[in-house]
């Protein structure tokens, strides 16, 4: 059994790719057709992991993002072929396990984390969607708060949010086949122990029986970032060489108890609302925007004073993922309390990613003062056109698209008398950060496009950065 993936013009119109209708690039019928063919090929041909650990197949992300940014058929082909060589064939379905799952869906719980069962999970979720519809299946397996759903929800946040991004794209573009891929990827994903933080925070709040309704302005995420930096017991002993395992082995296994009291302060009332000056404030919308602004700030403002600018690979993912919480917030079939929980988890886990990068110093001027000769005069449309021609695995385009959406989301609050200090990225900082993302990646081979842990001195000792500095690329250096 295989899902049919087919995109229509309405799917793109309804997407969040272009919040301002006037700036929407045209998407041709040929591009829609080619995107559907490429997504179908990826669905039928390739494993969701190109290697056993941390190797996420980004093809669907790249194709859908390029399409949303107005890609031509040839540019969509580029989005597919850029990473085709590294992919692994999709594994065979295990018929015995599939029969077991059909007979007892709860059997899935004991199979979570088996990456070689991806195809089996995919076939199972496709059959469930065919029978019950994708909204019902996502509700049952992700949002129902059963023991199985809780585990699968946590796994959506594992691996730098990749399964969550995949699910968000599937929902945004109305593609049940992509949604099935996301659920199967989450089920097959390795365990990074992030439940120690996410569930630990909720347990700590419940233990205090703290169900108060917010009546005062809460601490900003930026303030909580400062608190993380002020607690070196969380991050001071991190080792650069551990890279992929730092979140599990160091942050979650050894420092979660230190991080929980800080992360627990990022809260939204279950109703998503708050009384302020006699009026209802929509805290779900406000704090979703704040989360996106803070993620962008962490990604752009964490630099080295000794090297040309580079954006951190891990913090970049916190920005990319931020867009999809607007997708989830727009789904009335998801209970509002669950939509609140999704945003709370994102804000709390972003704090862990900041610690994971060794809590780098932050300087907003790094973003606000940024300029380079190539992108200086580019508007968003020019940036979209340029990034669609880049050889990339989709990361730059996803980052840029998320920034554009976050800019629109944050605009009402950037100068707000109550909320302005919660929004560290303001005005033209958004487009300057997008320009930085393009310029600092466009000449780099895949392994050198990003910094891998910006708070570590070792991350900045790469020969390419020393060479760039010696060549006098001061336009990209920190003032």
Curated annotation (Swiss-Prot):
Q: Name one Pfam family in it.
A: Questin_oxidase
Q: Which UniProt keywords apply?
A: Oxidoreductase
Q: Which domain of life is it from?
A: Eukaryota
- Record region (Disordered): 14-34
Q: What are the protein's GO molecular function terms?
A: oxidoreductase activity
Using the record, list the residue span of the signal peptide; answer none if the entry has no such feature: none
The record's similarity note reads: Belongs to the AflY oxidoreductase family.
According to its UniProt entry, the function of this protein is described as:
Baeyer-Villiger monooxygenase; part of the gene cluster that mediates the biosynthesis of the tetrahydroxanthone dimer secalonic acid D. The pathway begins with the synthesis of atrochrysone thioester by the polyketide synthase AacuL. The atrochrysone carboxyl ACP thioesterase AacuM then breaks the thioester bond and releases the atrochrysone carboxylic acid from AacuL. Atrochrysone carboxylic acid is decarboxylated by the decarboxylase AacuI, and oxidized by the anthrone oxygenase AacuG to yield emodin. Emodin is then reduced to emodin hydroquinone by a yet unidentified oxidoreductase.
Q: State the protein's name.
A: Baeyer-Villiger monooxygenase AacuH
Q: Which organism is it from?
A: Aspergillus aculeatus (strain ATCC 16872 / CBS 172.66 / WB 5094)
């Amino acid at each position: 059994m295989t899902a049919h993936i087919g995109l229509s013009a309405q799917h793109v119109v309804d997407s969040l790719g272009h919040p301002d209708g006037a700036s929407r690039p045209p998407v041709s019928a040929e591009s829609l057709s080619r995107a559907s063919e490429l997504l179908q090929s990826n669905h039928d041909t390739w494993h969701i992991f190109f290697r056993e650990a941390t190797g996420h197949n980004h093809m669907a992300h790249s194709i859908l993002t390029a399409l949303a940014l107005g890609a031509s058929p040839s540019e969509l082909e580029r989005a597919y072929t850029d990473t085709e060589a590294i992919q692994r064939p999709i594994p065979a379905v295990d018929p015995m396990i599939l029969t077991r799952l059909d007979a007892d869906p709860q059997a899935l719980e004991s199979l979570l984390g088996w990456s070689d069962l991806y195809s089996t999970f995919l076939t199972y979720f496709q059959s469930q969607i065919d029978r019950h519809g994708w909204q019902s299946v996502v509700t049952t397996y992700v949002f129902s708060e059963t023991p199985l759903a809780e585990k699968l929800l946590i796994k959506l946040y594992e691996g730098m949010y990749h399964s969550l991004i995949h699910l968000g794209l599937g929902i945004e573009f109305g593609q049940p086949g992509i949604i099935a891929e996301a659920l199967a990827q989450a089920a097959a994903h390795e365990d990074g122990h992030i439940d120690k933080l996410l569930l630990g925070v909720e347990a700590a709040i419940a233990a205090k029986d703290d169900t108060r309704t917010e009546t005062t302005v809460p601490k900003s995420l930026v303030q909580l970032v400062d608190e993380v930096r002020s607690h070196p017991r969380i991050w001071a002993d991190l080792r650069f060489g551990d890279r992929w395992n730092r979140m599990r082995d160091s942050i979650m296994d050894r420092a979660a108890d230190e991080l929980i009291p800080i992360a627990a302060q990022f809260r939204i009332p279950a109703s998503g609302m708050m009384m302020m000056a006699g009026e209802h404030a929509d805290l779900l919308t406000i704090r979703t925007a704040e989360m996106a602004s803070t993620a962008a700030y962490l990604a752009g403002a964490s630099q080295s004073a000794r090297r040309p600018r580079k954006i951190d690979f891990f913090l970049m993912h916190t920005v990319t993922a931020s867009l999809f919480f607007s997708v989830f917030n727009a789904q009335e079939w998801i209970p509002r309390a669950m939509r609140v929980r999704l945003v709370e988890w994102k804000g709390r886990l972003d704090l862990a990613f900041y610690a994971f990068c060794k809590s780098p110093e932050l300087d907003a001027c790094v973003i606000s003062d940024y300029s380079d000769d190539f992108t200086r005069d580019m508007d968003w449309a020019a940036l979209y056109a340029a990034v669609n021609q880049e050889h990339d695995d989709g990361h730059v385009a996803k980052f840029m698209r998320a920034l554009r959406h976050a800019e629109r989301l944050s605009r009402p609050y950037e100068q707000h008398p109550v909320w302005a200090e919660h929004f560290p990225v303001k005005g033209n900082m958004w487009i300057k950060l997008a320009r930085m993302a393009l310029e600092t990646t466009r000449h780099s081979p895949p392994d050198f496009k990003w910094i891998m842990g910006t708070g570590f001195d070792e991350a900045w000792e790469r020969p390419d950065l020393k060479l760039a500095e010696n060549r006098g690329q001061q336009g990209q250096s920190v003032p």
